[in-house]
Amino acid sequence: MGETVCTAVQAADDMELVARADPLLGVALQDVLEEAEVVVDFTRPDTALANALACVRAGVHVVIGTTGFDPAPLAQARAADGRQRANVLIAPNFAIGAVLMMRFAAEAAKHMEKAEIIELHHDGKLDAPSGTAARTARLMAEASGGTPPPIHSVRLPGLVAHQEVILGDLGQTLSIRHDTISRESFMPGVLLAVRKVGSLEQSPVVGLENVLF
């Protein structure tokens, strides 16, 4: 994902790629923070937390797409610090269609009796259920006032990222599905987050919808 993000940033007229932080390249994040206004992180959850804290202390905004990232420790650290030095946006999914799917599912959950979520990903994905599915279930529960719907996870070679929300009521069902065919589908959302993270009124926030709607 990092290579795809770098390519997208380089192609954007209003952005400049100033560094690629990667231990395999011998480049540590702390060594390049002075050059950056925004850092995009697609690492592992434990690494992403340390990276985000380092960025915030340096006054650098952060966009996090790391799968399975828990924002609670970051929020606690920010609250303890007491200063709003930089903003953090965490997105379970950067695909615009996926964000719309979650929004539609939350709206439908207000009107349909029951629902279940099926999420399918490549067999190299580390977390199950996916962050997108967990976020969808949470939004649906908040909208309906009920409990989060069950989530079924599938991990198989040949898949990229897919999710279907199936809602049922008396004599009818409703299916809302999103399919990611290529990782390039995430890039418009990543670039949007990079452009908007600095103007967030609260931080950290979870969900691309915070800058999309």
Regions found by a protein language model. Give the residues of each.
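Short glycine- and Lys/Arg-enriched binding-loop motifs that mark or flank ligand-binding interfaces
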Residues: 61, 93, 127
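C-terminal substrate-binding/catalytic lobe of Rossmann-fold NAD(P)-dependent oxidoreductases
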Residues: 2-33, 46, 112-213
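Rossmann-fold NAD(P)-binding glycine/threonine-rich loop
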Residues: 46-53, 57-58, 65-90, 96-99, ...
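N-terminal Rossmann-like NAD(P) cofactor-binding module of classical short-chain dehydrogenase/reductase
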Residues: 39-40
